[in-house]
Swiss-Prot record:
Alphabetized GO MF terms: G protein-coupled receptor activity; photoreceptor activity
Domain of life (superkingdom): Eukaryota
Gene: RHO
Gene3D superfamilies tied to this protein: Rhodopsin 7-helix transmembrane proteins
Organism of this sequence: Procambarus clarkii (Red swamp crayfish)
Function: Photoreceptor required for image-forming vision at low light intensity. Can use both retinal and 3-dehydroretinal as visual pigment. Light-induced isomerization of 11-cis to all-trans retinal triggers a conformational change that activates signaling via G-proteins. Signaling via GNAQ probably mediates the activation of phospholipase C.
Cystine pairings recorded for this chain: C126-C203
Name the record gives this protein: Rhodopsin
GO-annotated cellular components: cell projection; plasma membrane
Length: 376
């Protein structure tokens, strides 16, 4: 690292030999081959506290191992358990795959840059790194959108809704990846660009350039990849209303008949579907918690850049990377049939509880109904 950190790197690029913002800045730690990608805004900040890098490295090591292991197990269990190979669960597998790919491509480079305290992997890989991060994040959110639409179709529309088939689920997944690639490949063709973040340990979209072309990309990307996917909120409101009406009807009918409960096979099916909807809602909520900081960084960079320092830019992708860990944990804890399959295939990782027997019965009913719908 001493090869580029002992002298200001600006001299070799024809820039003023004296830094107007101070004797040594965070940019002076960067290799010369990426200086043309760094916005002048970052020249006014001193290097980050050296303790930030080992802390970030430890965090990435912890989340990287958890994410890769958790999502690999999720994919393996779903694909090797016949009762879990339903059209709806193809979306779950796609979600785990996008999370796995995100950490598989983000984790090793972050370890390297944290070790050297700056981006050392060259300008080309900086662009590839940012592209892959955006691509996997975009695929994750749109997968959650389609999972929500499927739950809405099953719970709110019921028998009136068209059952999800393998062909339709596959078409949805293809749409997700085509949409994601289309948006994320645009910066390679001049609509915005991928550049090093202010902390110089990662790369992302350019939110500091003031030209209309760069900003228009961020406006459109934010709309299609963040704001538009907020539509599932409407679906969840409808789901909650449908579940509340169903439960009230069950209680009223049981009261009239003088019995404790009307829970039968159909009611168990509805209960299992509602649990799956809660899982999806939790996962979507965690996704927005994870990606909102990065969105805020982009918008602050466009309209209030004076508040944006290199340290603040770390939190955006720290939260974003942590999102890839949430999903396998949510499904492992909340999906009865997944727990049952993991209990059988990987007893050392099981988390089965005493109440799982009843939940598993209800979940089996749901899966059977889905399989019948698929074959119809």
């Amino acid at each position: 690292m001493s090869s580029w950190s002992n002298q200001p790197a600006m001299d070799d690029y024809g820039l003023p030999s004296s830094n107007p913002y101070g004797n040594f800045t965070v940019v002076d730690m960067a290799p010369k081959d990426i200086l043309h990608m760094i916005h002048p805004h970052w020249y006014q900040y001193p290097p980050m506290n050296p303790m930030m890098y080992p802390l970030l490295l430890i965090f990435m090591l912890f989340t990287g191992i958890l994410c890769l292991a958790g999502n690999f197990v999720t994919i393996w269990v779903f694909m090797n358990t016949k009762s879990l190979r339903t059209p709806a669960n193809l979306l779950v597998v796609n979600l785990a795959m996008s999370d796995f790919l995100m950490m598989f491509t983000m984790f090793p480079p972050m370890m390297v840059t944290c070790y050297y305290h700056t981006w050392t992997l060259g300008p080309t890989f900086c662009q590839v790194y940012a592209f892959l991060g955006n691509l996997c994040g975009c695929a994750s959110i749109w997968t959650m959108v389609f999972i929500t639409f499927d739950r809405y179709n099953v719970i709110v529309k019921g028998v009136a809704g068209e059952p999800l088939s393998t062909k339709k689920a596959s078409l949805w997944i293809l749409t997700i990846w085509v949409l994601s690639i289309t948006w994320c490949i645009a910066p390679f063709f001049g609509w915005n660009r991928y550049v090093p973040e202010g902390n110089l340990t990662g790369c992302g979209t350019d939110y500091l350039s003031e030209d209309i072309l760069s900003r228009s990309y961020l406006y459109d990307y934010s709309t299609w990849v963040y704001y538009l996917p907020l539509l599932p909120i409407y679906c969840y409101v409808s789901i909650i209303k449908a579940v509340a009406a169903h439960e009230k009807g069950m209680r009223d009918q049981a009261k009239k008949m003088g019995i404790k409960s009307l829970r039968n096979e159909e009611a168990q099916k509805t209960s299992a579907e509602c649990r799956l909807a809660k899982i999806a809602m939790t996962t979507v909520a965690l996704w927005f918690i994870a990606w909102t900081p990065y969105l805020l960084i982009n918008w602050v960079g466009m309209f209030a850049r004076s508040y944006l320092s290199p340290v603040y830019t770390i939190w955006g992708y720290v939260f974003a990377k942590a999102n890839a860990v949430y999903n396998p944990i949510v499904y492992a804890i909340s999906h009865p049939k997944y727990r049952a399959a993991m209990e059988k295939k990987l007893p050392c990782l099981s988390c089965k509880t005493e109440s799982d027997d009843v939940s598993e019965s209800a979940s089996t009913t749901t899966s059977s109904a889905e399989e019948k719908a698929e074959s119809a």
